[in-house]
């Protein structure tokens, strides 16, 4: 379809290979399609957070034959749509609100424990302490072991650029 061609152009070959590997992991019978239930898991593994409602809406948009399964072409179209949605600018008030939610103790910083809770939610328990510390050091500009709002904002912008 035209959407598939647009998706192929939008992604680098390396990204398409990553998507294909993730897709194939869940295509257990090798039939070339996966159930819609497994899609949420794949998208999480690829670092995309998406609500159940958003996922269902995306599935409805690409599952043209209403089979309840998604083939790789439909999956790639879906990933392209998800990426385009994620490119919208996040208003500062939304970023500040998210920061306040994550700053559980209200001290104006996201410390290691608060960040660990977020990372566990996003990546499961797959993240080791070393990986967590390495990530924190990459973005902790003043090396105080925690993120202030500006550092947090930089993380969000960087993650959006990666995807």
Swiss-Prot record:
It comes from the Eukaryota. Residues 14-49, 50-85, 90-125, 127-162 form the EF-hand domain. Ca(2+) 3 binds at residues 103, 105, 107, 114. Keywords: Acetylation, Calcium, Metal-binding, Methylation, Muscle protein, Repeat. The modification N6-methyllysine is found at residue 20. GO terms for cellular component: myosin II complex. One of its GO terms (molecular function) is calcium ion binding. Ca(2+) 1 binds at residues 27, 29, 33, 38. Pfam families: EF-hand_7 (PF13499). Ca(2+) 2 binds at residues 63, 65, 67, 69, 74. InterPro entries: CALM/Myosin/TropC-like, EF-hand-dom_pair, EF_Hand_1_Ca_BS, EF_hand_dom. CDD domains: EFh (cd00051), EFh_PI-PLC (cd15898). The keyword Calcium applies. The modification N6,N6-dimethyllysine is found at residue 20. The keyword Acetylation applies. The modification N-acetylserine is found at residue 1. This protein binds three calcium ions. Troponin is the central regulatory protein of striated muscle contraction. Tn consists of three components: Tn-I which is the inhibitor of actomyosin ATPase, Tn-T which contains the binding site for tropomyosin and Tn-C. The binding of calcium to Tn-C abolishes the inhibitory action of Tn on actin filaments. This is Troponin C.
